C-alpha cells in the first residue's frame, strides 16, 4: 500500500512530492500506483527458482537488474497449435509482463532509482498481475516449462503473469518456445561458430554447457540452442 504524504516520514512506501525513499513490494500483498513517482530504492520480496519464472514490475528493468540469464516478452500463441512463443529482449518497460530465466534461485531483489509507473494495462493474452488471488481458468507457468490451465484451487501471487485464452482454445497444456528475433527455425545442418566462445542451452532456456569452441563440446543427440541458433545434434 502506498501513502501519499505532505511531509517526509521515516517509513516504507511513503510518496512525497513525487519521490519515495524506500519502496517495498511483497508478492503476498496487492499493489497499485495512481500516479507516476520516482523510487530511490526498491526492494522486491519474492523468490524465483532456477529456470523460467514469470514476472511483471511497475518499472523499467533489464536482465542485469533482474540478475537473470535472459528475459523475454510474449510474442504469440501459434494458431491451431499448443505452443507459446516468447522473444528474448534486452529490457522490459514498466507494466509489461515477461519471463526471466535463472541459473540458480534468487530470494530477494533490490533496485535503485526507478521510475515507478501508474498501474494501467498489464498486457493482453499474457497478462501481469499485482494482486494475489485465484488463477482458475488461467494458464500458469510450471516447473516443467509448460503453461497449464489452473483448476478450481489454483492461486497466483503478485508480480507474476499468466496466459488468458478463449475457452474455445481447448488446450489444457501449452509448450514454451523462445526466439532471439532472428532465427526461429531448426537448422538441420553443420554450423560453424568459428573460434568464439560457445554457450549451449536447452529449449527451456537452461544453460547446459560452455566451451571455447564447438570441438570441445560432447553433446548427446537432441535439439539445443547454441549461440542463439537452434541446432539438431545427430
Predicted regions and their residues:
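Short glycine-aromatic motifs
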Residues: 72, 139-140, 224
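Short linear interaction motifs
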Residues: 78-86
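A short, polar beta-strand/turn micro-motif
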Residues: 4-66, 87-187, 232-234
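C-terminal outer-membrane/trafficking sorting elements
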Residues: 182-234
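Generic serine detector
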Residues: 30, 47, 70, 82, ...
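A residue-level signal for beta-strand positions that form part of recognition/binding surfaces
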Residues: 83, 123, 197
Amino acid at each position: 500500500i502506498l501513502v501519499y504524504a505532505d511531509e517526509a516520514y521515516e517509513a516504507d512506501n511513503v510518496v512525497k512530492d513525487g519521490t519515495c525513499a524506500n519502496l517495498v513490494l511483497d508478492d503476498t500483498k496487492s499493489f497499485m500506483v495512481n500516479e507516476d513517482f520516482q523510487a530511490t530504492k526498491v526492494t522486491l520480496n519474492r523468490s524465483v527458482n532456477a529456470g523460467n519464472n514469470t514476472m511483471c514490475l511497475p518499472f523499467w528493468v533489464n536482465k542485469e537488474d533482474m540478475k537473470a540469464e535472459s528475459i523475454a516478452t510474449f510474442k504469440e500463441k501459434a494458431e491451431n497449435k499448443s505452443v507459446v512463443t516468447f522473444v528474448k529482449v534486452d529490457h522490459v518497460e514498466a507494466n509489461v509482463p515477461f519471463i526471466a530465466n535463472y541459473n540458480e534461485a534468487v530470494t530477494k531483489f533490490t533496485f535503485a532509482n526507478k521510475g515507478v509507473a501508474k498501474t494501467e494495462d498489464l498486457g493482453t493474452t499474457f497478462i501481469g498481475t499485482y494482486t494475489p488471488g485465484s488463477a482458475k481458468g488461467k494458464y500458469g507457468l510450471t516447473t516443467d516449462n509448460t503453461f497449464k490451465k489452473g483448476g478450481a484451487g489454483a492461486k497466483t501471487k503478485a508480480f507474476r503473469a499468466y496466459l488468458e485464452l478463449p475457452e474455445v482454445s481447448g488446450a489444457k497444456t501449452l509448450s514454451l518456445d523462445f526466439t532471439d528475433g532472428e532465427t526461429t527455425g531448426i537448422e538441420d545442418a553443420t554450423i560453424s561458430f568459428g573460434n568464439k566462445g560457445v554457450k549451449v542451452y536447452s529449449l527451456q532456456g537452461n544453460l547446459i554447457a560452455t566451451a571455447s569452441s564447438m570441438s570441445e563440446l560432447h553433446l548427446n543427440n537432441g535439439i539445443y540452442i547454441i549461440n542463439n541458433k537452434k541446432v539438431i545434434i545427430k
